Amino acid sequence: MRVVFMGTPDIAATCFKRIIADGFEIVGCYTQPDRPKGRGMKMVYSPVKEVAIANNIPVFQPENFRSDEVVEELRALKPDICAVVAYGRILPQRVLDIPTCGCINIHASLLPQYRGSAPYQWAVLDGLKETGVSAQHMVLEMDAGDVIDVEKTPIGENDTAGEVLDRLAVLGAELLSRVLTRAKNGDKCCGTPQCKEDVTFAPMLDKSMCPIDWTKTACQVHNQVRGLHPWPVATMELQGKKFKVHATRVVEGSGEPGEILGLTKTGLKIACGEGAVEVIQLQAEGGKRMAAPDYFRGHP
């Protein structure tokens, strides 16, 4: 079975490594074009491209699939199936129609929940206790395909989005390998249509979401800090200074929203609209990440 892999970030690289290790015949890899990064604006390969190069797999990096030339380049690979994980590119219908067995996507949510670009982050922001990954048959509508199979994982009360993603990457790799094995053995991998009444969306995160609103409940503030970590990171202002807030926990306490209730051995206690949170780790603008008590001992 001839497989073309499409993906870009770390979660995709984890899945890519797994199906390479499992011995699938991968005839090509599609990933986003190299991008300039860092102070020197040096061109950087995507994690998926790094894996492809290390395993001598041909790499293709089109900006899009609008041109006939790009589409025919994919067709020439004669894929039986395309495995797509966080590619970051829209696939038009004429691309979806190329593989004889279709395109299979691994999405980082339990579909139909959280269709869109930031599924696991919104699961944490919304305070969910469980999330997972879904394997779906790709259709033109975003994340709307029939669901073939899922893997689930709990979300701990202090888990960050980044920590959840690490687990989802491993689960996604297992799920992709399992579905490809079924397809290789002749299974059509029929899926279940998504219930339209249960559809929710996970729009892209942006920095406008970062400032903490202390009138919210302690749980909501804590979920904001967890869901926006490691990017774009929640922020607060204190004594005229701006801080990134890397870690909090919900604690007992009451006061006016935003009122400083005290500095403990483990953090800075701040009142919310309901309850309080303890800021455990923060980062002053231009500074490094520190335990809150350590920072305030040096900045009384």
PLM feature spans:
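Donor/substrate-binding cores of folate-linked one-carbon enzymes
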Residues: 21-22, 32, 81-201
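Acyl-group handling in specialized metabolite and lipid biosynthesis
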Residues: 203-216
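Short beta->alpha connector loops
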Residues: 9-11, 63-66, 87-90, 251
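Conserved beta-strand segments of alpha/beta enzyme cores
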Residues: 25, 56-58, 102
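N-terminal glycine-/serine-/threonine-rich beta1-alpha1-beta2 phosphate-ribose binding loop
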Residues: 36-78
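A residue-level signal for conserved active-site and pocket-lining positions in enzyme catalytic cores
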Residues: 7, 29, 52, 82, ...
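An anion-binding loop in the catalytic cleft
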Residues: 215-300
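N-terminal Rossmann-like dinucleotide-binding module
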Residues: 1-42
